[in-house]
UniProtKB/Swiss-Prot annotation:
Belongs to the PlsY family. It is found in: Cell inner membrane. Keywords: Cell inner membrane, Cell membrane, Lipid biosynthesis, Lipid metabolism, Membrane, Phospholipid biosynthesis, Phospholipid metabolism, Transferase, Transmembrane, Transmembrane helix. It comes from Pectobacterium carotovorum subsp. carotovorum (strain PC1). InterPro entries: G3P_acylTferase_PlsY. This is Glycerol-3-phosphate acyltransferase. Its EC number is 2.3.1.275. Probably interacts with PlsX. The gene is plsY. Pathway: Lipid metabolism; phospholipid metabolism. It is a multi-pass membrane protein. Signal peptide: none annotated.
Length: 211
């Protein structure tokens, strides 16, 4: 392993450790996502406690902190295997952030950003897979699970040299979703539409006149 590859993995982990959900909620005066909603500091939980704009902001930053280190490593000539390890390091930072007592999110958006530099065709397929699954099922977690399962096959088709590291990344995402998988199996998982309604109801109560 070269010094460059090792350095990029360290940088990727530190970038991943910057929790945009926690920081944005602090700046915006929103509740700590680790202590409200699902307890997960990620875009989906921020959607529940802060609304669409807050969730979109967190989503963009979570994608970028996976994308930028991998792109930088690619520009520096890091080999495919270590590019994959750089991507995994960014996701590990998001999941176990050193700056936030190692309590982070599930790494889906960061993983998506880390895979994006492989190619825009792959990025489009991954986006389409997630969106289609969510639209058909209503479950954001199921979209992440299906995308993680199918990602190695997409990568094998477009850029086979990245298949192994992407498969490792997919395993990491699936492990982080074991609770969601159990809730889906038992029919207890909350649909994303319900999260939007729960956010809207308190706002309606605040703005409605007293009877």
């Amino acid at each position: 392993m070269s010094v460059t590859a090792l350095g990029m993995m360290l940088i990727a982990y530190l970038c991943g450790s910057i929790s945009s959900a926690i920081l944005f909620c602090r700046i915006a005066g929103l509740p700590d996502p680790r202590q409200h909603g699902s307890g997960n500091p990620g875009a989906t939980n921020v959607l529940r406690i802060g609304g669409k704009a807050a969730a979109a902001t967190v989503l963009v930053f979570d994608v970028l902190k996976g994308m930028l280190p991998v792109w930088a490593a690619y520009a520096l000539g890091v080999s495919p295997l270590y590019l994959g390890l750089t991507a995994i390091a960014a996701c590990l930072g998001h999941i176990y952030p050193v700056f936030f007592h190692f309590r982070g999110g599930k790494g889906v958006a960061t993983a998506f950003g880390a895979i994006a530099p492989i190619g825009w065709d792959l990025t489009g397929l991954m986006t389409g897979t997630w969106l289609l699954t969510v639209l058909l099922s209503g479950y954001s977690s199921l979209g992440a699970i299906v995308s993680a399962l199918i990602a190695p096959f997409y990568v094998w088709w477009f850029k086979p040299q990245f298949t192994f590291p992407v498969a490792m990344l997919s395993c990491l995402i699936l492990m982080r979703h074991h609770d969601n998988i159990q809730r889906l199996w038992r029919g207890q998982e909350s649909k994303i539409w319900n999260k939007l309604r729960k956010k809207k109801q308190p706002e309606d109560e605040k703005t409605s006149p007293e009877e």
